[in-house]
Amino acid sequence: MTTHPSRREFFGTTAAVAAWIRLRGPHSGATGAESGGQAGGQRLPLKLGLASYSMRQFPLDQALAWAKTMGVTHMTFKDVHIPRTDPPETTRALRAKIEAAGITIMGGGTITIPNDPAQIKKEFDYAKNAGFPLIFTDPDPAALDTIEQMAKTYDIRVAIHNHGPESKNWPRPQDAYAAVKSRDKRLGLCIDIGHTLRTGTDPVAACRECRDRLYDMHVKDLAVKTDVNSQVAVGRGVIDFPGLFRTLIDIGYQGQVGLEYEINPKDPLPGMIESMAYMRGVLAAVAT
């Protein structure tokens, strides 16, 4: 049985976590393009970030304000916050707003890409205007040849996002890895550790196995390994975060470790604060 660090060891109760965030101030979190920030003055070796989908029921300004509250400076963006239907100049203006807020844009998605060259080009144009260095996607396998060519043309990475047992094409990271391992290096994976676990696959082992094409990561926790509806705040479930972070450090992972907090969409901030605090605490402990 995997032994997880006690939540109390780091932060005590949820109220203590919230107090920790308030005391540390809005600017003392993740800082610097090469770091996940600091915890207790210790510089962290991974980029702990946030998927804007966690705040999908709130406007961009609120999402950026909450990121500041949590000290987050790395984010990926869903099209609810940077709409794909906006004209290019509007997309570029939103990009400028995000960057002015001190956020490093790590990518965008998830975008469902069909086997339609014209539509694929539109998605890459959108990504370019939005400042995405990476698109994470659930693509039609038949579209991969065109996606590969566009990735080369635009010099934008594309990471296939695994979606668990319900996915016809990409249930496990290994399914995506098999499709990209012989293609251009711009094609890789966005591993969703919760969806990975639900397939009966060890997320930690999957990260190590797919390490040379691991470009992005969605982080969540589950109380029950196979239950999509059992998501909880990070650290309250069964996923081995100490093992995950040790592995990511060991393989030299350079992408974002992005919290995707999908529950409590009408009031996500307390759970995001708790999750981010736990992630920082665990990372500080394993990096010592």
Q: Residue spans of the language-model regions?
A:
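Beta-solenoid repeat scaffold
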Residues: 33, 95-96
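A short alpha-helix capping/helix-coil boundary motif
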Residues: 41-44, 72-76, 100-105, 125-128, ...
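Hydrophobic faces of well-ordered beta-strands that scaffold small-molecule active sites
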Residues: 46-51, 75-77, 105-110, 135-137, ...
